[in-house]
């Protein structure tokens, strides 16, 4: 029997007290630790800086994708990760760096305030703060508005031709020989770097950069209204996130190509990539995980996206920025002050963060899983043909699968449901008459609302998209809100496909070409 005054368990005691206090640095074994990254990983301030810098250099060194003298564009968002990335590049080019970075950096900031409903004054204040931070780096920088996507050319959706480079070691040796021949002692100053590599830094060039930035910072009001209408047409916050990511990628690619940058550094951390992995799988982008979360994204051909901060967790970045006074700018985004179930991206982030709080190895486990994913040889060796690439994200199309697939079954189900819906909603079908008779199109005088030009073009437009982008476009109320360069490129590809169908019987297959 249970007694009223019986004690069933001893008094709880704090067993963790004193375990993390008074620890010495795990590296130098001398100084007192000032931070604890993980259980048992205590660092002093100087050793933590050495550890942080070494990890950045090692990530770049073991991949060897940035050649000496190459122009690299740093994508700066104002957040902690991109701020730490810019700081690492800045320190890598200082006079005190033992092994200086040998590329030429530039910085790009994209103002996305319109998507969050920010006023013109708030956007100008944010851009002023960003400009003050970027001016302290001494690197050339560009500040553009997201509205500039409405003035992009259609060629931005075409995959560029990769530049054929020599062996990495040969490029380094040739660069060192050029340095010795020119009698240079270092690359500490960015202006010396630009002059050494033949980049024009004259006053006329600086004035042209100022005019370029002025044009991009103050877009026309019509572009602002179009951007507002585009995001208003998205039914869900998930679609808005995907649409923003797509437009931002297009604008970064355009600036990189226009200004001659062959590499773009992005500041995604290990934590951010773990969230992206889960959300992308949920959004039907699992086929492109090696491109979306890997170190190097080469889908654009002539411009590669690299992620040198992917080895760092957000905790490490926060410690580094706090200890060494790295400036950052807080700018509200689409996911600022929203509910945890408002979008798939937000739900994935909350899920990862809560698991990480209870199980500290969650992020590293998910991240290490993504490292094992590689692009298949078929996708990697695909040509630059327009129909083989997604119209929006430029990834290899993952919809060219057999009939015995889940994608094909989903398409049949969608087609049948849409056909039944059109049968009941189409006034022409309900009256037993065709909407177009005797060769006359119903788009003439008096045609009904059920016959919209865009509705006829929608199927061919969707066929040019990957599965993930199809889900995003499905949440748009109208395709007319998309930028003109997207619609023009879709029309151009449609004409090429129709032309190829007309002459297909006269073309030789690859097997026939080999026989001849």
Swiss-Prot record:
Transmembrane segments: none annotated. GO terms for molecular function: nucleotidyltransferase activity; tRNA binding. Keywords: Cytoplasm, tRNA processing. Its main location: cytoplasm. It comes from the Eukaryota. GO terms for biological process: protein urmylation; tRNA thio-modification; tRNA wobble uridine modification. It is found in: Cytoplasm. Pathway: tRNA modification; 5-methoxycarbonylmethyl-2-thiouridine-tRNA biosynthesis. Coiled coil: none annotated. GO terms for cellular component: cytosol. HAMAP family: CTU2. Belongs to the CTU2/NCS2 family. Plays a central role in 2-thiolation of mcm(5)S(2)U at tRNA wobble positions of tRNA(Lys), tRNA(Glu) and tRNA(Gln). May act by forming a heterodimer with ctu1/atpbd3 that ligates sulfur from thiocarboxylated urm1 onto the uridine of tRNAs at wobble position. This is Cytoplasmic tRNA 2-thiolation protein 2. It comes from Xenopus tropicalis (Western clawed frog).
């Amino acid at each position: 029997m249970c007694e009223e005054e019986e004690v069933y368990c001893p008094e709880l005691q704090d067993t963790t007290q004193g375990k993390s206090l008074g620890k010495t640095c795990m590296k130098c074994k001398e100084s007192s630790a000032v931070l604890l990254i993980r259980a048992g990983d205590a660092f002093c301030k100087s050793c933590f800086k050495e550890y942080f810098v070494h990890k950045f250099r090692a990530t770049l060194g073991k991949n060897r994708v940035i050649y000496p003298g190459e122009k690299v564009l740093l994508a700066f968002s104002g957040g902690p990760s991109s701020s730490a990335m810019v700081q690492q590049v800045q320190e890598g080019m200082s006079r005190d760096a033992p092994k200086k970075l040998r590329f030429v950096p530039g910085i790009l900031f994209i103002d996305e305030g319109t998507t969050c409903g920010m006023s013109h004054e708030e956007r100008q204040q944010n851009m002023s703060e960003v400009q003050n931070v970027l001016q302290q780096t001494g690197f050339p920088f560009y500040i553009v508005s997201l509205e500039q996507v409405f003035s992009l050319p259609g060629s931005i959706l075409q995959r560029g031709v990769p530049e054929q480079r020599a062996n990495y070691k040969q490029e380094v040796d040739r660069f060192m020989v050029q340095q010795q021949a020119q009698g240079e002692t270092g690359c500490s100053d960015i202006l010396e770097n630009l002059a050494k590599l033949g980049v024009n830094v004259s006053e006329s060039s600086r004035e042209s950069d100022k005019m370029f930035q002025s044009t991009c910072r103050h877009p026309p009001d019509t572009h602002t209204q179009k951007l507002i209408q585009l995001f208003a047409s998205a039914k869900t916050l998930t679609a808005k996130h995907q649409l923003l990511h797509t437009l931002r990628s297009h604008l970064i690619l355009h600036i990189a190509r226009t200004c001659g940058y062959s590499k773009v550094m992005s500041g995604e951390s290990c934590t951010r990539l773990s969230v992206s992995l889960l959300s992308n799988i949920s959004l039907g982008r699992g086929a492109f995980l090696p491109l979306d979360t890997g170190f190097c994204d080469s889908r654009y051909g002539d411009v590669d996206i690299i992620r040198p901060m992917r080895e760092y967790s957000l905790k490490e970045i926060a410690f580094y920025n706090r200890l060494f006074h790295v400036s950052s700018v807080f700018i509200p985004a689409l996911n600022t002050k929203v509910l945890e179930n408002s979008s798939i991206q937000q739900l994935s982030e909350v899920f990862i963060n809560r698991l990480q709080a209870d199980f500290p190895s969650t992020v590293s486990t998910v991240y290490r899983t993504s490292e094992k994913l590689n692009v298949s040889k078929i996708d990697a060796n695909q040509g630059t043909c327009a129909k083989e690439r997604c119209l929006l994200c430029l990834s290899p199309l993952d919809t060219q699968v057999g009939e015995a697939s889940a994608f094909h079954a989903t398409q049949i189900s969608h087609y049948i449901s849409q056909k039944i819906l059109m049968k009941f909603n189409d006034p022409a079908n309900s009256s037993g008459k065709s909407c177009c008779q005797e060769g006359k199109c119903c788009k003439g005088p008096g045609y009904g609302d059920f016959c919209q030009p865009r509705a006829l073009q929608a199927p061919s437009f969707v066929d040019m998209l990957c599965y993930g982008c199809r889900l995003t476009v499905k949440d748009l109320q109208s395709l007319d809100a998309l930028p003109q360069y997207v619609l023009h490129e879709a029309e151009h590809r449609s004409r090429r496909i129709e032309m190829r169908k007309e002459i297909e019987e006269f073309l030789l297959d690859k097997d026939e070409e080999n026989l001849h």
